[in-house]
């Protein structure tokens, strides 16, 4: 969505309308990435989809955080009281990936929570065509669901910040 150099200048959305617009853009991004994930999952090479999902999901989380003004760098630029509000709100909504550097280990931990889906996808690859379609479908819905959950968590954190009165980062 944005290049890394733009990260520090993206602000937390300033109103409920802005949050809704960012939410919808991010949900569209989630759907596009979920379709990519499903396409890779349909390829009958065991393990390829897992590696692809790790990378796609890490990029997705970074992009969503940036769109909401909630990346690690963006939160660091907030005034201390707003930083605290952002992290408390993230903990409150279960947004463990808000304001964090998304690493492979973090993504693996999250994907392990949906481990049964991964096992079903891999087992489905043993059955030609029908298994590939099932694997792609499971991959799409799992990826989309996890992405949507993160979008909603970011939207709630952004709403908390707007309610608290944040509209621009503090400059050093």
Question: PLM features: residue spans?
Answer:
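Ordered, soluble secondary-structure elements with a strong preference for glycine-centered loop motifs
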Residues: 51
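Terminal, membrane-proximal amphipathic helices
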Residues: 1-40, 54-172
């Amino acid at each position: 969505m944005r290049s890394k150099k733009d990260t520090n200048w993206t602000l937390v959305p300033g109103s409920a309308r802005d949050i809704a617009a960012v939410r919808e853009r991010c949900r569209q991004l989630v759907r596009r990435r979920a379709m990519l994930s499903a396409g890779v999952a349909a390829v009958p090479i065991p393990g390829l989809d897992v590696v692809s999902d790790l990378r796609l999901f890490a990029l997705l989380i970074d992009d969503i955080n940036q769109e909401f003004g909630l990346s690690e760098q963006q939160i660091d630029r907030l005034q201390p009281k707003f930083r605290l509000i952002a992290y408390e709100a993230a903990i409150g909504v279960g947004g463990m990936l808000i304001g964090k550097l998304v690493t492979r280990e973090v993504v693996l931990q999250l994907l392990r929570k949906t481990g049964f889906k991964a096992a079903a996808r891999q087992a489905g690859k043993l059955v030609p065509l029908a298994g590939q379609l099932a694997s792609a479908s499971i991959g799409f819905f799992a990826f989309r669901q996890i992405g949507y959950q993160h979008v909603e968590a970011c939207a709630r954190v952004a709403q908390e910040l707007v309610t608290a009165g944040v509209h621009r980062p503090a400059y050093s």
